[in-house]
């Protein structure tokens, strides 16, 4: 079975300057976990739920955060105050950050003519869950682990292709 038989055609994509809050809205609206990131018609990256979780993890406030008493406040070095302000600002403005700041730049892709088994093996090898499908440099679909499972299940039940 070919990738073209199992892929989702016309995948949801987003421009590289899309704010993260809009990307998250696209994830939720379309029940997806990743978006191909485009500059014009060119695929330039991939942003996934994992990228967002990693960002939140890196922006987390330390568990050993020390909050001074009013008497100790005078003794806090000014650099600690500046770092705290930067952290608060970063946490407040994550939603405004463009996806290009956190996306994966090296995108592993598939072609329509690739066998589904080869696409599955590539996903396993690369530790990813979806592959944009390209025809030349144009994105024509996306294939996910769920698409592969659906296609295999459909072939076993006598149906043709994914639903």
Question: Where do the protein language model's features map onto the residues?
Answer:
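Tandem CBS (Cystathionine beta-synthase) repeat/Bateman regulatory domains
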Residues: 1-163
């Amino acid at each position: 079975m070919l990738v073209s038989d199992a892929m989702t055609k016309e995948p949801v994509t987003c421009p590289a300057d899309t704010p993260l809050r809009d990307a998250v809205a696209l994830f939720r609206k379309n029940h997806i976990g990743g978006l191909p990131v485009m500059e014009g018609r060119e695929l330039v990256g991939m942003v996934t739920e994992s990228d967002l979780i990693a960002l939140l993890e890196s922006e987390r406030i330390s568990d050993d955060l020390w909050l001074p008493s009013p008497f100790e406040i005078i003794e806090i070095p000014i650099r600690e105050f500046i770092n705290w302000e930067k952290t608060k600002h970063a946490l407040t403005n994550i939603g405004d950050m463009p996806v290009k700041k956190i996306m994966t730049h090296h995108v592993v892709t598939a072609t329509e003519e690739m066998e589904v088994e080869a696409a599955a093996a590539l996903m396993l090898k690369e530790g990813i869950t979806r592959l944009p499908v390209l025809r030349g440099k144009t994105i024509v679909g996306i294939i996910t682990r769920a698409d592969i499972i659906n296609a295999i299940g459909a072939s076993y039940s006598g149906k043709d292709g994914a639903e």
